[in-house]
Amino acid sequence: MAPSSVDSASLCSDIPNSAPPSPSTALSSPARSSPPPQHPPPAESTGLDDIFGSSPPPTAGLSAEPPHTASSSHCEPSDLPSLRRQHVTAGYRDGISAAKHEHVQRGFDAGFPVGAQLGMRVGVVLGVLEGLVRCSPSASSSAPGKRSESGTTAAPSLDILQLYDLAKSELAVQKVFGGVAEIDSEVKPEQDSRLKLEKAGEEVVSKWEETVMRLLGNRS
C-alpha cells in the first residue's frame, strides 16, 4: 500500500474524534454537573428587626420573656374587684330601700283602719273627761272639802282632773300599742297582724270607756 493512501486513511479516521460536540450535548452536560442550590442561613434577630419587618413571630418574643416578668404581668391591680364591691353595695342598698317601701306601705294599709277606729274611741273618752273637768268647779278657786257658791264641793273636781291627766297618759299611742310585743306569743304567726293591734288597743280603750260610763252614771 502506498504511503499516501495510509496517511489519508488515518486522517479520515481522526476527523470524527476532533469534531465539535452537537448543540444538544453541549446544553445537557452542564445541567447534570451543576451543584444543588444552597439556602442562606437564617438571619439573627436584632434590635432593628421590627423596623425592617424581619422580626420573629410574637410567640417567639413571649417565650423569650423572663419568667418573673410574665408572672408580674398577671399580678397587676385591676378595677374589677372595686367595681364588683361598688355594685354589690349599691344593689344591697337598693334592695333594702325597695323592701322597706313595700312593707311600710303594706303596714300602713293594714294598720290605718285599726288605728282610726281606736283613735275615735279614745277621742270620745278624752272629750267626755275634758267636758266634765270644764263643767266642774275649778280646784284652784276652792279648797278640798270646801263648798263653793253653787253648793258643790271641790273634791270631785280634783278627782276628775286627776282622772283626765291619767287618761291622757295611758291613752297615748305608745301606751295603747305598747303591748303588741306581749301579744306576739299569744297570737299565731299565720294570723293577720291587725289582730295584734286590735287586741293590744282594745284592752286599754275598753277599760277607759267603762270608767267614763261609770262616772257619767254617778253624776246623773
Swiss-Prot record:
Region listing for Disordered, in residue ranges: 1-81
Location of the protein in the cell: Cytoplasm; Nucleus
Chain intervals with Pro residues compositional bias: 33-43
GO CC annotation terms, alphabetical: cytoplasm; nucleus
Source taxon at top rank: Eukaryota
Signal peptide bounds: none
Biased composition (Polar residues): 1-11
Entry function: The complex LTO1:YAE1 may function as a target specific adapter that probably recruits apo-RPLI1 to the cytosolic iron-sulfur protein assembly (CIA) complex machinery. May be required for biogenesis of the large ribosomal subunit and initiation of translation.
Stated family: Belongs to the YAE1 family.
Protein name: Protein YAE1
